[in-house]
C-alpha cells in the first residue's frame, strides 16, 4: 500500500469500463487497459496506441458463458453458445470487439491482421509469465477494498 501511495501523484484517472478513453482523449499516455480496448482504440482512430506485456508477467483474464442450472430455455441457451462458437461467427465477434476467440478454427476465418495480431493473441513465451488472479477469499478481498477506497480518497 505504501508503494502505491507514492505512485498516486502520477495517477490521472481510473477507468475500467472503457480504459481506451483516457488515451483517446489525451488525458494519459501510459496506463492499464485490456487488450481488446487497445484494438478498439486503434480501430477508432488511434492506431499509434500500443499494448505492452511486462516481461515480469501479466494478468490474464477470460470471459465465460454459463447457464444456471435452473435456467429456463436451457436447450436454447446451449444452441446459442454452440452458434456463437461456430468458427464463422466467433471470428465475426472477435473482429467486432477486438478480443480473441477460444475457438482456434475461428482464427482461419479472421482477417490476417487480426488472427496474427500479438495484442489479440499473445505469443506463448509471453503467456508463460502471465497468471490468472486467484480467489483470495472474503477477508482479504475486504482488506483490498479498504486500501483501494483509501487510495481513491487520498488521490
Model-derived features: positions:
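Ligand-binding pocket segment of bilobal, Venus flytrap-like solute-binding proteins
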Residues: 1-54
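Conserved C-terminal helix/tail region of periplasmic/extracytoplasmic solute-binding proteins
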Residues: 124-155
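Sec/Tat-exported extracytoplasmic proteins
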Residues: 8-11, 27, 42-45, 69, ...
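Non-transmembrane alpha-helical segments in soluble domains
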Residues: 1, 5, 20, 24, ...
Amino acid at each position: 500500500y505504501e508503494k502505491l501511495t507514492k505512485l498516486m501523484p502520477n495517477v490521472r484517472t481510473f477507468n475500467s469500463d472503457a480504459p481506451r478513453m483516457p488515451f483517446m482523449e489525451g488525458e494519459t499516455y501510459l496506463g492499464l487497459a485490456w487488450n481488446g480496448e487497445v484494438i478498439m482504440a486503434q480501430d477508432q482512430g488511434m492506431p499509434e496506441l500500443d499494448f505492452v506485456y511486462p516481461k515480469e508477467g501479466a494478468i490474464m483474464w477470460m470471459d465465460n458463458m454459463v447457464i444456471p442450472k435452473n435456467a429456463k430455455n436451457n436447450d436454447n441457451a446451449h444452441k446459442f453458445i454452440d452458434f456463437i462458437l461456430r468458427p464463422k461467427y466467433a471470428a465475426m465477434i472477435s473482429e467486432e470487439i477486438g478480443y480473441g476467440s477460444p475457438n482456434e478454427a475461428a482464427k482461419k476465418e479472421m482477417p490476417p491482421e487480426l488472427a496474427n495480431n500479438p495484442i489479440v493473441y499473445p505469443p506463448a513465451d509471453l503467456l508463460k509469465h502471465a497468471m490468472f488472479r486467484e480467489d483470495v477469499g472474503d477477508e482479504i478481498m475486504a482488506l483490498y477494498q479498504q486500501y483501494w477506497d483509501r487510495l481513491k480518497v487520498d488521490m
